From Swiss-Prot:
Organism taxonomic ancestry: Bacteria, Pseudomonadati, Pseudomonadota, Betaproteobacteria, Neisseriales
Function text: Binds together with bS18 to 16S ribosomal RNA.
Name of the protein this chain belongs to: Small ribosomal subunit protein bS6
Species, as recorded: Neisseria gonorrhoeae (strain ATCC 700825 / FA 1090)
UniProt record, GO biological process: translation
GO molecular function: small ribosomal subunit rRNA binding; structural constituent of ribosome
Family membership: Belongs to the bacterial ribosomal protein bS6 family.
Keywords recorded for this protein, A-Z: Ribonucleoprotein, Ribosomal protein, RNA-binding, rRNA-binding
InterPro entries, per the entry: Ribosomal_bS6 (IPR000529), Ribosomal_bS6_CS (IPR020815), Ribosomal_bS6_sf (IPR035980), Ribosomal_S6_plastid/chlpt (IPR020814), Transl_elong_EF1B/ribsomal_bS6 (IPR014717)
Keyword Transport attached: no
Gene Ontology CC: one annotated term: cytosolic small ribosomal subunit
């Protein structure tokens, strides 16, 4: 299996649907015996340039380990989801698990850590 970093941005009017979208993508990865090493919700941020007259969007970062076929399925899902404005998939040499420098590490909502803490609390 290969390691990938995926960033996708969602239309700001669809921000409330981001958790359901992330859950759907997580199941696609885990059903194919893939692993999610890092999953961060960066929230709504200013775009560098307007996309379809939209100036802000909701960002999500995923570092995963899976097969190229699953990555193709994910990219197809991104392409046919009208809420996803842009997506980028990069193949990496190794798994990245530390917090991203984008938000200074601790500000980022790490969805994997949050899920692990909820499971430990129950």
């Amino acid at each position: 299996m290969r390691h990938y970093e995926i960033v996708f941005i969602v239309h700001p009017d669809q921000s409330e649907q981001v958790p359901a979208m992330v859950e759907r993508y997580k199941t696609m990865i885990t059903e194919a015996n893939g692993k999610i090493h890092r999953l961060e919700d960066w929230g709504r941020r200013q775009l560098a340039y307007p996309i379809n007259k939209i100036h802000k969007a909701h960002y999500v970062l995923m570092n995963i380990e899976t097969t190229p076929e699953v990555v193709g399925e994910l990219e197809t899902a991104f392409r046919f989801n009208d809420a996803v404005l842009r997506h980028l998939t990069i193949k990496t040499k190794h798994a990245v698990t530390e917090a991203s420098p984008m938000l200074g590490g601790e500000k980022a909502k790490n969805l994997l850590v949050g899920a692990a803490e909820e499971a430990a609390a129950q």
